[in-house]
Design a protein with these regions (language model features):
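Mature, function-bearing regions of proteins
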Residues: 2-425
Length: 425
């Protein structure tokens, strides 16, 4: 028998490789989900005993591992959804902060604050999340001394105090942040969020709401979802200010895609909104073909994510939770850089070495815009949590933010995070 008859053919080898890969995906795709649900199996029968630390750890399965892009984008869209309430759109239009040259900063600031208190530990019963432990070790005392979650909430509260936002507006925003990721995972994700994960989101975000001093938060996720639906039906109504913000938002989002695709992208975003939000924002009805295209695209994304893509090797987060280096000089406060980029390179460091050479070459060839390059105007040295917000407030409120964060923690903010304030307002 000749050797050619004993060796498998190339098509056979290819088929074996493809089948082996698909089997690998099938065997590993649910790795994180199964791990979390085995770890907290004792809580599934009794949701009421779920602690804050456990809830935060559970939320990380979807947010950082399984469907991070869907969770992150849906939470951004949850904020955008508030633009369809005239009471809130009037406030936002009055701030002048959603102008073309500043809107990207507002998006990254919001992402940094939300990501920080979503992944950094709180001083509560139980160990920190596995994600935090992987970056910082198992020292629970060190985790308890990490003030970043409280600094992010304190700064967010300080910013909100400058606007006449009503309690119900805060509460419906909280509901959007809890439930929109659940709905988007059902529509676009390769898996849905389990009842345990939904309850964990409620437990975690209810605590955030309490730290924000939101009153009358319902005692269950079901009650909050029902309340939010009724509130939205009554108050999400058409207004010119809604439309102004919608146009600005669509322009900002479309700027991240090639120019030839922006028209279609805009139509797809409007379809994602749903009819109530579209009407409130006074945007045009979209053709059935565009809705069908969105549904087909969502189905393909779900199929590919479930059957063709292996699980992530590393968690994805907009911010780092690793220990930060001690500043070189007494007058150089510790700063951080985000791990994500919006349409402008806010807070990103300048490139060095060969990357810097490549960047200059791309600029010279016109392959990259100067607006995409980190620079002082984009705060390329990084951010500090007590400085987050509009440029005009970058240097104010620091001492009060430190004070409020310390009060929430039960001890003063210390170490590299503690910095003297320039003003108290």
């Amino acid at each position: 028998m000749s050797p050619s008859n004993t060796l498998p053919s190339l098509p056979s080898i290819g088929a074996i490789a493809v089948l082996s890969y698909l089997l690998f995906v099938r065997l590993t795709r649910w790795r994180v989900y199964n791990h979390v649900h085995r770890k907290y199996a004792h809580r599934i029968a009794d949701f009421d005993t779920l602690t804050l630390a456990e809830a935060q750890d559970i939320t990380h399965a979807a947010m950082l591992w399984d469907v991070p892009s869907i969770v992150m984008n849906s939470m951004s869209f949850a904020i955008v959804r508030t633009y369809a309430f005239p009471a809130m759109s009037r406030i936002l239009c009055g701030t002048k902060e959603l102008q073309p040259d500043t809107v990207s900063r507002r998006y990254i600031d919001t992402a940094i604050l939300v990501a920080t208190y979503s992944v950094c530990p709180f001083r509560t019963k139980g160990p920190p999340s596995e994600f935090y432990v992987a970056a910082n070790g198992t020292d629970e005392d060190a985790a308890a001394a990490d003030p970043r979650a409280y600094l992010a909430i304190a700064r967010m509260n300080w910013l909100h105090e400058h606007y006449p936002i009503k309690n119900d507006d805060f509460l419906v925003t909280l509901a959007f942040l809890i439930f929109l990721p659940v709905r988007w995972a059902e529509r676009f994700g390769w898996r849905t969020l389990s009842p345990l994960e939904v309850h964990a989101r409620f437990v975690f975000w209810k605590h955030i709401g309490e730290l924000m001093h939101i009153r009358d938060i319902p005692d269950s996720a079901v009650e909050l979802e029902v309340w939010a639906e009724e509130y939205e039906a009554r108050h999400m109504t058409p207004a010119d200010t809604n439309h102004i913000l919608a146009e600005g938002m669509l322009t900002e989002l479309a700027s991240s895609v090639p120019s030839f695709a922006r028209g279609l992208f805009r139509r797809l975003v409007i379809c994602v909104m749903g009819e109530r939000m579209r009407i409130a924002m006074k945007l045009p009805v979209q053709p059935p073909a565009v809705h069908a295209l969105l549904d087909i695209g969502a189905a393909l994304v779900r199929f590919a994510g479930r059957h063709l893509f292996p699980p992530r090797l590393h968690a994805y987060c907009a911010v780092s939770v690793k220990p930060v280096p001690i500043p070189k000089g007494d007058n150089e406060p510790t700063r951080m850089h985000p791990l994500m980029k919006v349409t402008k390179p806010w807070y990103l460091p300048r490139t060095t070495g060969m990357w810097r050479v490549l960047e200059k070459l791309m600029l010279a060839l016109g392959l990259r815009s100067i607006d995409d390059v980190p620079a002082p105007k984009y705060d390329d040295k990084g951010y500090r949590l007590e400085e987050i917000g509009p440029v005009r407030w970058k240097t104010v409120g620091h001492a009060l933010v430190m004070q409020k964060a310390g009060e929430m923690m039960g001890c003063p903010v210390q170490g590299v995070w503690a910095q003297p304030s320039t003003k108290i307002t």
